[in-house]
Each structure stands twice: as structure tokens, then as C-alpha cells.
Design a protein with these regions (language model features):
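Structural signal for interior beta-strand "rungs" in well-ordered beta-sheet cores
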Residues: 49, 113-185
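Terminal amphipathic alpha-helical/low-complexity segments used for targeting or macromolecular assembly
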Residues: 1-118, 177, 183-184
Length: 185
């Protein structure tokens, strides 16, 4: 499933990504990396990481082109995956993730929100006072939204859900029959 919340700004040259993480002493032929993903969902053209032996079974079958790992774990990776050795795997992954998804680290307020009275949900949802709804929001049937709540852009809420008062929802896919209590963020 593609990520509905954050925009991928790639592809990037592998050597440019390594410079970001100060791992440029390891150099590879010019190759474009499309995305950073977990071991299980990565494909050719992606970069992944292995930081714990607990994921060794997933590592053996990864389809990623590159993997950031350490000396201790690199033997679990398939021959088709080029190994990038790091002493600080998770920090390097954070730097690369920030490059691919720069808006994933911000906590900016969604300025696309508008009062629910001005949206398509005005007559479809029971709601309290002062409710703000962002763009591209989906809300199922039989839902309730409490006072002073904000549902930011690209949120999907299933059927028969209740959202309490003073709730802020961002970057979420909410299934059916979910109850979010007052004050949750």
C-alpha cells in the first residue's frame, strides 16, 4: 500500500544517500534508489535496513537492492542485496528517510481544514461545536464527532466510529467500530 500521508521525493543516487549518512567511503556504481522500505516490502531499486537478528528470516528473502546493516548481521542478506555497513544503523536510516520523506518530520498544522458545516459531512455525520475537517477526508456512516475536534487531511474513518471532544487526528487510517476518547492526539 502506498503511503497516503507523506510524499516520496525520490529517486536518489545511492552515493548521494551515503554522503548524507557519512558512509561515502563505501561507494557503488551509479544506481537510483526509489524508496526506503522495510525488509519485507522492499523491491529492486529500494534501500532497506537490518538492525536486529530477530529479523534475520525476513532479511534472507528481501528483494531490496541495498541494505544498511552491521558486520554481525550482513551474512543474513541474499547475494542480490548490496550491503552497506554502518555502526549507527537506525540513525543512518533516519537520515535517509528524512531525505525521501521530508514532510514526515514536521508537525505543522494542516491549513486545509475548514469547519464541518462547510463540508460534505454537514448532513452525514453527528457532530458537536467547532469541528474542523481537512481535505480528502473520508468518514463512514453512523459516526459521531465531539466538540472542538480536528480531523486533518487524508484521514479515513470507517463506519460506526466515535471521536471524542478535543481530539486531533492526523496521519491515520481508522477502521470500523473505533472509539477515540476525549483529548486524544
Amino acid at each position: 500500500m502506498s503511503n497516503p500521508f507523506f510524499k516520496n521525493t525520490g529517486p536518489y543516487d545511492i552515493n548521494d544517500l551515503l554522503k548524507l549518512t557519512k558512509l561515502e567511503y563505501q561507494s557503488f556504481e551509479k544506481e537510483r534508489i526509489k524508496d526506503i522500505k522495510d525488509l519485507n516490502s522492499s523491491q529492486k531499486g529500494d534501500i532497506t535496513f537490518l538492525h536486529s537478528k530477530r529479523y534475520s528470516n525476513l532479511a534472507k528473502s528481501t528483494k531490496a537492492s541495498f541494505c544498511i546493516t552491521n558486520e554481525r548481521l550482513n551474512s543474513f542478506l541474499p547475494a542480490s542485496c548490496k550491503i552497506i555497513i554502518s555502526d549507527k544503523i537506525l540513525l543512518d536510516v533516519a537520515q535517509i528517510t528524512k531525505k525521501f520523506y521530508p514532510n514526515s518530520i514536521t508537525d505543522d498544522f494542516d491549513d486545509s481544514v475548514e469547519y464541518i458545516e462547510n463540508t460534505q459531512f454537514k448532513d452525514k455525520v453527528k457532530y458537536g461545536r467547532n469541528i474542523l475537517i481537512g481535505k480528502n477526508v473520508e468518514i463512514g456512516s453512523k459516526c459521531l464527532i465531539g466538540h472542538n475536534s480536528i480531523i486533518e487531511k487524508n484521514i479515513s474513518i470507517g463506519d460506526n466510529c466515535s471521536i471524542g471532544s478535543n481530539v486531533i487526528i492526523k496521519n491515520s487510517l481508522i477502521k470500523n467500530n473505533v472509539h477515540i476518547l476525549d483529548g486524544c492526539v
